[in-house]
Structure formats: C-alpha cells, structure tokens
Amino acid sequence: MMEAEEQPWKTTFYSKLPKVELHAHLNGSISSNTIRKLIAKKPDLKIHDQMTMIDKGEKRTLEECLQMFQIIHLLTTTPEDVLMVTKDVIKEFADDGVKYLELRSTPRGEDATGMTKKTYVESILEGIKQSKEENVDIDVRYLISIDRRGGSSAAKEAVKLAEEFFLSAEDTVLGLDLSGDPSAGQAKDFLEPLLEAKKSGLKLALHLSEIPNQKTETQVLLNLFPDRIGHGTFLSSSEEGSPDLVDFVRQHQIPLELCLTSNVKSQTVPAYDQHHFGFWYSVAHPAVICTDDKGVFATRLSQEYQLVAETFHLTQSQVWDLSYESISYIFASDSTKADLRKKWSHLKPHF
C-alpha cells in the first residue's frame, strides 16, 4: 500500500527533473494525439493510431519498428504537416520537463505535394522558431539525419543542406545523425560525406552497433571520432562485444545516447536489467538517457529516467547527476551549456 501512495510523488520527481533530450527522431516522436490530427486530414489512407505506436507490454522486431515509420511518412507529406508535428513534439517535450532538445529528422521530398527536402528542413526550423516566439520553455536545435537506405548520394545531399543551414540558421542546425536500417548500406558509403561535414564544423551523432555482428562496420564509423554514439547496443555485450571497441570508446570518452524502452520494445535488448546502461554506468562513462521515438514506443523522457533509476537502483541524487552531466554532451556552444547549468542549479531540489 505504501508503495502505491509513494508512486505519484516519485513520478513528480522525474517529470519535474530538468532534462536534456539528445536522441529524438521527429517522426518517431509524434504522439497519438497528433497522429489522430494527421489522420483526420487524410481519411482516405485508412490508417489508425495503433498502427504507429507500440503499447505497454508489446514488442516488435526492429524491422517492424522501421516499417512503422513508412506509415508515419504517409501522414507527413506537406510543409504544414511537418510544421504542426514539430510544434506539437516540442511542446510535449517541454511539458515533460525537457529544457534542451536536439531533434533529428531526414529531409524528405514529396513530389505529390511539392514539398522539397529544403522546404522540409525549413518547416522544422519554422516550428522551432514559432515555439520560441510562443515562449515554450525549451531550447531546441536540429540535427539533419542521413538515412542509410538512401546511400551515398542522399548522404551528400543531406550534408550540403546541413552546411547551408549551419551557416544561416542562427545556431539551430548543429550536426548530422546517421541512422535508418542498420543492415542497409555499408559504413564506407558514408565516410566521404561525413568527413566533409566534420571539416565544416558540423557535429556527428552516429547510430552504431545497433545489431550484432557488425564489428568491422562499427570500427569504420568509430574511426571518424563521432561526437556521440547512438545506442551502441552490442559494443559491450558479452556475446558480441569487443574489448578493443569498448577501449576505443572509453579512451576517447565518446558519450552514448541510451534508449531503454526503445531497445527492449524493438527486442535488441532482452530485458531492462540487461540493458547496456548498466555496463557504461558502472565504468563511469559519459551516457545520456533518451527516448529515441517517444511516439512509436509510447514513452516520455521522465519515464525513461524512472526506468533507469528503478532498474539500476539509483538514488535521486544519482538521477540528478545523470541529468546534469548530460549538459556536457550537447552540441550547442559552451555559453548555452553554462546557461543550462545555471538553470539546473536554480531548479535543484534539496535531497
């Protein structure tokens, strides 16, 4: 009985905790409320919201999760759709106590509606701008995603767009994300555009070691010295892990973006208590808790922090430190980091 009474208070701690979200795919972060608004605009598609979300206790294969994105893409085909989605997602993160957010999304053109990759990016930037003008209490930046399925030519196009907006979008576009189906393409296809991006001053967040048996692929990407690693699920696992890869990541102190619900629901990790957060936390390696796709996986960042705390027996003080330390891994400037640290200090409860 006591535990049930404590639960709302505990939940309040996690939702009030100021948080940084560094691994959030825009289209995967669309809530069921927003999905319903999009469905209402396109009734002929005969899509219902259960086709885009994995409920509590349910699981899908990674492949099935990726297929859900195809459905979501059918719903976001105009600049107006993208603008609405961006604003809704930003507001929902802010409502969950997220104070700094790096959204990521692959620029997408739609011949039928006339949306180009450039207007897609502009719609996201407009959503960020309007949210700021409406005083939503969150600092939002954008990473342009390279979808592995698009191959080298789409990657080069994404880098060009990122370079263009990096110079013109007032510090909003900060870097690139390499993501999409981890079995599509090869790392070497993306080396040239990613190196070009690095030379331009863009930051790199690379999904790697998401699936087993990718040691060579992982090493190729690590040789780029990415600024952050997405998932890194099999870097440290006893069956597939490689001590030299782990040593490389530790030696270069490359932060990991870790997404518990996503990994368990997509079955790349068998159970929460076997999540690789445990390994990296035990060696005091930089790691940041993230949602990945809060819409698809029906989660919130406060829920992810609660999961981590309860699974790995962290105190409130340790949870606070985990959140505070994540400020160090953002792609924005040192002055932004200093502002966020001030904000955290101001909001810090007495433990």
Curated annotation (Swiss-Prot):
Binding site for N(6)-methyl-AMP: 25, 27, 73, 105-108, 147, 180, 210, 292-293
Database matches in Gene3D superfamilies: Metal-dependent hydrolases
Cofactor binding: number and manner: Binds 1 zinc ion per subunit.
Enzyme Commission (EC) number: 3.5.4.-
GO biological process: adenosine catabolic process; inosine biosynthetic process; nucleotide metabolic process
Active site (record annotation): 210
Protein keywords: Hydrolase, Metal-binding, Nucleotide metabolism, Zinc
Residue sites binding Zn(2+) per the record: 23, 25, 207, 292
Catalytic activity: N(6)-methyl-AMP + H2O + H(+) = IMP + methylamine
InterPro entries: A_deaminase_dom (IPR001365), Ado/ade_deaminase (IPR006330), Metal_Hydrolase (IPR032466)
GO molecular function, one term: adenosine deaminase activity
Function recorded in the entry: Catalyzes the hydrolysis of the free cytosolic methylated adenosine nucleotide N(6)-methyl-AMP (N6-mAMP) to produce inositol monophosphate (IMP) and methylamine. Is required for the catabolism of cytosolic N6-mAMP, which is derived from the degradation of mRNA containing N6-methylated adenine (m6A).
Subunit structure: Monomer.
Entry protein name: N6-Methyl-AMP deaminase
Gene that this polypeptide is encoded by: MAPDA
